[in-house]
């Protein structure tokens, strides 16, 4: 939820933004308020005002995969012109098509490879990274047609103090799609229309948390999530199980003893 794209001190610049669109559409969490880039090689760049630490980056509500974009790269730099830079993540199109095939790498544990995989639709992207410290960060990509991006986020991720595994519902396994079956007057099947897609409502209950973690880490997130969306990413799969999520309710925080307590939330969202 820590997102420098929405920070007041940050300034956004870009190349190739189509007429009628504005790069500052990326300065909020609203997926419907998108920026559209023209065909060609383009970039979106953030100036954080000073060097900042980040250990995640996310791109949501985009068309990078269905538009078969190539050379998708995220870099950090201390130079506004990116004369020198460090590559934080790359996505390479191995095969064009519907769906296309992508592979890549990203700077986690120094370097982690992303195996070549078929990418259906436009899943939200979330890379977990080793901590990087730069003032400027830039997304670059090449596309043969216009492409939209709705949300970008970089910052420091919040990791849970305790893991949870049994009974958890991974987002990609539980996509919820509302459809309407269309029939003729005579009852002949004409097709199925998708009305809405998203993920099933998920509840996370976190037990045996230290009071200090709740106070220092959970409560700042809670204050953010009361009003704004957040990225929920489960596991280490940059192209799946990443949600642009909103909270529905918070579980009552409870004291277990003088050292430990429990918190939780119920949320829903989208995965593409």
Regions found by a protein language model. Name each.
Residues 74-76:
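Conserved aromatic beta-strand anchor motif in extracellular beta-sandwich/beta-rich domains
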Residues 1-42, 52, 58-69, 78-134, ...:
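Extracellular/virion structural assembly segments
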């Amino acid at each position: 939820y820590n997102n420098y794209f929405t920070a007041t001190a940050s300034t956004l610049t870009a190349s190739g933004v189509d007429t009628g669109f504005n790069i500052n559409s990326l300065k909020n969490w609203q997926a419907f308020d998108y920026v559209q880039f023209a065909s060609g090689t383009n970039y979106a760049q953030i100036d954080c005002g000073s060097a900042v630490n980040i250990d995640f980056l996310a791109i949501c509500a985009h068309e990078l995969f269905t538009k078969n974009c190539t050379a998708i790269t995220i870099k950090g730099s201390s130079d506004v012109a990116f004369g020198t830079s460090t590559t934080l993540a790359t996505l390479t199109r191995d095969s064009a098509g519907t769906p296309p095939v992508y592979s890549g790498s990203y700077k986690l544990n120094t370097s982690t490879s992303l195996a070549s995989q078929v990418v259906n639709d436009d899943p939200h992207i979330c890379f977990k990274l080793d901590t990087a410290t730069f003032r400027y960060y830039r997304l670059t990509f090449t596309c043969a047609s216009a492409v939209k991006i709705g949300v970008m986020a970089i910052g420091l991720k919040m990791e849970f103090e305790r893991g949870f595994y049994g009974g958890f519902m991974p987002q990609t396994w539980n996509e919820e799609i509302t459809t309407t079956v269309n029939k003729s007057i005579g009852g002949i099947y004409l097709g199925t229309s998708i009305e809405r897609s998203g993920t099933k409502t998920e509840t996370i209950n976190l037990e045996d948390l230290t009071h200090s973690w709740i106070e220092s880490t959970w409560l700042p997130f809670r204050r953010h999530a009361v009003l704004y969306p957040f990225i929920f990413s489960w596991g280490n799969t940059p192209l799946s199980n990443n949600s642009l999520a909103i909270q529905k309710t918070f579980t009552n925080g409870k004291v277990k003893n003088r050292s430990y307590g429990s918190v939780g939330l119920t949320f829903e969202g989208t995965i593409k």
